[in-house]
Regions:
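Anionic-ligand binding region
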Residues: 1-39
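A structural signal for well-ordered alpha-helices, especially hydrophobic packing surfaces
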Residues: 8, 71, 75-78, 97-104
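Short, charged/polar low-complexity linear motifs in solvent-exposed/disordered segments
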Residues: 16-17, 67, 78-80, 103-106
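Interdomain hinge/lid region at the active-site interface
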Residues: 23-93
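N-terminus-biased detector of the onset of the functional/mature region
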Residues: 89-95, 99-100, 112
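A conserved regulatory-domain signal marking ACT and ACT-like small-molecule sensing domains
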Residues: 105-117
């Protein structure tokens, strides 16, 4: 799953470009910080990431399948306006984000300075 954020970033930027072309609107010019943040990840070396995706393709494909399942579930929750279910996912994601920040990753150390169980 560690490669999934890069794959999603590349695809989110592509989606913005495709949406912009289809709707003939300047989506990218007027996008907010979220797209900018994803585009930072998408600015990574494309040759390196191609090689990473290909060398670890089984795990990458498995992560994509799980992501698609979760994305389709999210789509259904939005379609049917499942307020409690959506809030549960959003709150849990916020909680996980806080846990990630609380780990105080140190990029200069192996495993980002975390104890790996």
């Amino acid at each position: 799953t560690s490669h999934l954020p890069h794959l999603i970033a590349y695809n989110l930027v592509k989606t913005a470009v495709d949406f912009q072309k289809r709707n003939k609107k300047n989506i990218i010019k007027y996008s907010a910080g979220g797209l900018r943040d994803f585009s930072r990840t998408a600015a990574s070396n494309e040759i390196m990431w191609r090689d990473i995706f290909f060398s670890n393709n089984d795990n990458v494909i498995n992560s994509i399948n799980i992501f698609i399942k979760n994305l389709n579930n999210f789509k259904k929750l939005i379609k049917y306006k499942k307020n409690k279910n959506i809030l549960k996912i959003l709150k849990n994601s916020k909680k996980v984000r806080k846990q990630i920040i609380d780990l105080k990753q140190d990029v200069s150390k192996p495993n980002f300075g975390r104890d790996i169980l």
